[in-house]
C-alpha cells in the first residue's frame, strides 16, 4: 500500500491545465443544457444601445442567473464529486493531464463524503476570487484550500 510520500505530487502546471480543461468541459455541457435560454439571451442583445434596451437586457440576464445559479453550481459539484469518487480520482481534465486526487491519509481514492466536501469547497474557492487555489503555491503538497480541508492531494498517475 502506498503512502503520500511514495507518490509524485502533481505540478502546478498540470493542475492549472486540468482546472481549465474541466471548466471548458463543464461550460460546454452547461451550454448544451441551457441552449434554448442562451439563444434567447443572445437574440435579446440590443442592436441599438439605448438605455432602455440595455436595462431590459440586464434584467433578462439577472432573471437567467437567478433561475439557474443553483442548478449551475449543483452541476459543477456533481461533476467533480462523481468523477473524483467513481473515476479513480480523476475528472476528465485530470485524466487528460494524467493526474488524480487521492486521500492524503492513505493515498487511496476519496470516499464519497470527502469527494463531495472537496467539490463544495472548490466552489467556495472560486467564489472568493480563487484565493483558495493560490494557497497551493505555498504548501509542500501543493494543496488548495479544498484539498487541505477535504484531506486530499493531487498526484501524478
Model-derived features with residue positions:
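Hydrophobic alpha-helical transmembrane segments and immediately flanking/interface helices
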Residues: 133-157
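Short, small/hydrophobic-residue-rich motifs at membrane-helix boundaries and re-entrant hairpins
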Residues: 1-130, 156-157
Amino acid at each position: 500500500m502506498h503512502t503520500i510520500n511514495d507518490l509524485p505530487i502533481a505540478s502546478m502546471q498540470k493542475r492549472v491545465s486540468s482546472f481549465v480543461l474541466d471548466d471548458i468541459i463543464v461550460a460546454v455541457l452547461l451550454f448544451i443544457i441551457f441552449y434554448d435560454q442562451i439563444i434567447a439571451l443572445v437574440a435579446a442583445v440590443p442592436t441599438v444601445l439605448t438605455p432602455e434596451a440595455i436595462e431590459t437586457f440586464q434584467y433578462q440576464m439577472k432573471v437567467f442567473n437567478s433561475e439557474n445559479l443553483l442548478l449551475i453550481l449543483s452541476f459543477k459539484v456533481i461533476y467533480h464529486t462523481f468523477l473524483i469518487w467513481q473515476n479513480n480520482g480523476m475528472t476528465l481534465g485530470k485524466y487528460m493531464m494524467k493526474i488524480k486526487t487521492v486521500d492524503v491519509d492513505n493515498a487511496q481514492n476519496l470516499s464519497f463524503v470527502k469527494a463531495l466536501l472537496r467539490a463544495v469547497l472548490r466552489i467556495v474557492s472560486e467564489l472568493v476570487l480563487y484565493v483558495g487555489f493560490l494557497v497551493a503555491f505555498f504548501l509542500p503538497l501543493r494543496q488548495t484550500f479544498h484539498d487541505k480541508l477535504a484531506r486530499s492531494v493531487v498526484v501524478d498517475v
